[in-house]
């Protein structure tokens, strides 16, 4: 390596000369931080300060003579994202212990201040020839991606001398470019760099995955030159996690029909349901006639998530010409029940030219709604009934029925929101449009006043949506009643409702001076539970579809692990439903209401560390923003790198991913045991 004088501005040019070898036994899934002794009272104090978000007191540990305490404190600031800690963290970039340096660099990136850019660049170990600082240098590159200027994106893309065996450095470079992309900072150069990573099989799979995820995530559209090249790569790609990202990328072609043959060919031979789902979503905006055979074929797929994805696309993008076919599918006994319910909604939406058939189906759906006792089946039917706007009175009644399950009330409100925001609103109601609009506005305010956490959240979000076209001036007189609702909410359990109503007040009043209250209610960390565990403690989740075994990541997220263990031992999770399933993304549970808007009377801190959601099976804490976590958690079904900076990872699936992939909305957590 050449010895070149260091310059901050030319940092990444100097980085061209960096070489580092990564041992082949490097384990990407293992967090390589200092081992933490949770019986240490000072360690406990740091986590207690994190839980209380006491940044000022926590900062004293950044100068502790104990490297473990410096490390734990620096990591904590990656969760707090406290700007005032920046200078103290900068000192740790020269710490004698590399783990402390890594934690400090990560935290500085999390803080996101542009002035950290030059500080981070100056700390890059440019003379590291044996890889001692490879992970540290990689962390710096990713951190710059979170806080750097656009000029540094060019420098980051220009690095070309890392060897294909320099796994950590290549990951850092790729993650840095990816983080820029999440900030909507991308260009031809960054696209070409990530495309280069993807197209060359010699690069580590982890780097190729980051590149493919980047291309699928940024908002760019791709010309024929890019999509033609990626099409051949996609067809031959053996890694399904890379393949599913490439499929999503192809769906962003400037000329969508040019890549349709590739996607159709891939769908026919594809065995991974996740890739099939991405193919269906990729063809979503193509002309209906070109994808109609594919969608009807997918309705009969053996995987329920593939079939239901196809049904959803018929709802969104169907045609009047095929409406009768949708109705026939809704009663086809060879289709799965949940698929048939979705096809009812598709038929109801598109049977515009067949009023008698539509009315008959509408009545049948209402009868089925009354007959079924399953609240999640009721919710699907209510959303389907929204496809005929004249059902609004029935939907209002269901949203306000206190005897209805929370998920039903929320779904009814979502259905009303769909009607009032529909681009077909005026076509549907014609001369009655303004009268119906006023009725819907009144219904939404009634729902907000009901105080139901889920329904009120949806209603408050809806009244200020531009597509709802509600006159803000005429709503100003209702601001006092919105304030009254805020006062009645139970905090922090109804935090999402508070946030939605607060935003509605700000929007309607046209004011930027209204202060928002903070409602974090930290709970004392159960150190007895944590110290009685080991780093190999597991959780066994028995569900209605089978068992899932988790490794609890105590070293990575002790607060979240202790919270999860205590809820499990108390029996809290027993009988809870998987209320949210987004195919090829996450399955989520732990909501006391069963609709995703429930919580308990406390919050816990986010624990954001350098771990990545870089494969399936990571278990994270759901939240309504940092430090609002409580009882809800999710399991990923595929790599979800965009979640890294904001969602705690506290466990990893060891066994039972096949069960995770089978879960549907309404499936049950029977019990959770800790081993």
Where are the model-predicted features located?
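Structural detector for internal amphipathic alpha-helices that build alpha-solenoid repeat scaffolds
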Residues: 30-52, 68-82, 91, 101-114, ...
């Amino acid at each position: 390596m050449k010895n070149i004088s260091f310059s901050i501005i030319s940092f990444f040019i100097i980085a061209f000369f960096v070489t580092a070898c990564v041992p082949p036994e490097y384990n990407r899934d293992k967090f390589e931080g200092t081992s933490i002794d949770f019986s240490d009272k000072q360690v406990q104090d740091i986590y207690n300060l994190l839980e209380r978000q006491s940044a000022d007191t926590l900062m004293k540990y950044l100068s502790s003579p104990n490297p473990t305490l410096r490390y734990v404190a620096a990591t904590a600031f990656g969760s707090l994202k406290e700007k005032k800690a920046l200078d103290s963290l900068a000192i740790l970039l020269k710490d004698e212990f590399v783990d402390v340096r890594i934690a400090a660099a990560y935290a500085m990136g999390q803080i996101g201040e542009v002035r950290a850019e030059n500080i981070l660049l100056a700390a890059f170990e440019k003379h590291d020839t044996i890889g001692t600082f490879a992970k540290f240098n990689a962390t710096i590159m990713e951190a710059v991606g979170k806080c750097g200027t656009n000029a540094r994106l060019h420098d980051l893309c220009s690095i070309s001398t890392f060897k294909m065996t320099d796994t950590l450095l290549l990951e850092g470079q790729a993650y840095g470019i990816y983080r820029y992309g999440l900030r909507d900072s991308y260009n031809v150069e960054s696209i070409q760099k990530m495309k280069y990573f993807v197209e060359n099989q010699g690069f580590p799979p982890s780097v190729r995955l980051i590149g493919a995820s980047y291309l699928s995530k940024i908002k760019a559209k791709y010309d024929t030159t890019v999509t033609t090249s990626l099409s051949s790569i996609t067809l031959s790609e053996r890694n399904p996690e890379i393949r599913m990202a490439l499929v999503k990328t192809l769906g962003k072609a400037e000329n969508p029909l040019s890549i349709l043959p590739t996607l159709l060919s891939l769908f026919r031979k594809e065995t991974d349901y996740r890739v099939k789902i991405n193919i269906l979503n990729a063809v979503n905006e193509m002309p209906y006639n070109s994808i109609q055979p594919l969608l009807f074929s997918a309705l009969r797929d053996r995987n329920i998530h593939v079939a239901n994805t196809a049904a959803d696309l018929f709802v969104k993008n169907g045609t009047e010409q095929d409406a009768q076919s949708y109705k026939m599918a809704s009663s086809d006994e060879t289709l799965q029940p949940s698929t048939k319910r979705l096809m009812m909604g598709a038929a109801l939406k598109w049977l515009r030219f067949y009023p008698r058939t539509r009315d008959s189906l509408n009545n049948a759906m209402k009868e089925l709604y009354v007959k079924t006792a399953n609240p999640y089946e009721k919710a699907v039917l209510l959303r389907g009934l929204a496809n005929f706007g004249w059902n609004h009175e029935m939907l209002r009644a269901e949203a306000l029925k206190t005897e209805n399950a929370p998920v039903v009330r929320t779904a009814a409100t979502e259905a009303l929101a769909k009607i009032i925001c529909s681009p077909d609103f005026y076509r549907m109601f014609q001369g009655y449009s303004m009268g119906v609009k006023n009725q819907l506005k009144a219904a939404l305010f009634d729902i907000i006043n009901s105080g139901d956490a889920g329904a009120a959240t949806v209603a408050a979000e809806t009244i200020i949506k531009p597509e709802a076209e509600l006159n803000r001036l005429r709503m100003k007189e209702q601001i006092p009643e919105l304030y009254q609702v805020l006062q009645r909410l139970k905090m922090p359990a109804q935090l999402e409702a508070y946030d939605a109503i607060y935003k509605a007040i700000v929007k309607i009043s046209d004011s930027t001076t209204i202060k928002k209250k903070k409602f974090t209610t930290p709970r004392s960390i159960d150190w007895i539970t944590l110290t009685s565990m080991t780093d190999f403690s597991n959780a066994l989740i028995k569900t209605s579809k089978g068992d899932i075994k988790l490794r609890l990541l105590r070293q990575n997220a002790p607060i979240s692990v202790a919270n999860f263990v205590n809820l499990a031992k108390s029996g809290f999770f027993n009988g809870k439903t998987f209320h949210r399933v987004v195919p090829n993304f996450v399955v989520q549970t732990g909501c006391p209401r069963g609709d995703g808007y429930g919580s308990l009377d406390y919050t816990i801190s986010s624990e954001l560390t350098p771990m990545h959601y870089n494969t399936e099976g990571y278990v994270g804490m759901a939240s309504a923003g940092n430090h609002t976590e409580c009882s809800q958690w999710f399991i990923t079904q595929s790599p979800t790198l965009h979640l890294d900076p904001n969602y705690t990872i506290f466990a990893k699936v060891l066994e039972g991913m096949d069960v995770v992939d089978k879960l549907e909305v309404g499936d049950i957590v029977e019990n959770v045991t800790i081993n």
